[in-house]
Amino acid sequence: QAVRQMMTAARTAPKGKGIDIIEVAMVTDEDIKRLSEELVIMSGETGLKFFLRDADNILQAEAIMIAGTRQQVQGLNCAHCGFPTCVEKPKTVPCAINSVDLGIAVGSACATASDLRLDTRVMFSAGMAAQRLGMLGDCKCVMAIPVSASSKNPFFDRKTKTE
């Protein structure tokens, strides 16, 4: 129920130009294990040990909200992406407005979790794993918010993996 409220907050968050390109979903049970396994694979591929730490850490979540953005040029020619016009921006470079929209949606979801006194942490690592697993279709930038209701937030004061 609480994660659904977070998803609603992300869904209804303000969007640039009023265009909704945000996708949200809830990850539970076996899919959390799949995310964890993907993080282990990612650590092996990159050598980044914090992926291992996060692989263990998300197993303590009761659920994980994932949010991502479909890439869609907004046609503002604002140059915020680093290119003078939307036409000149390579397809592989995200529209800055898309990223801002995702940040606002994630912030809104976290504010809702805080209002409900839930423990969370925004994780790009678990978001990347969800993206690699296609959990949000063709979204190109995905963030994950593991959620727990416990006496101490399990997503902080984490130990770095050394092996």
In which residue ranges do the predicted regions lie?
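Acidic, surface-exposed loops and disordered segments
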Residues: 1-163
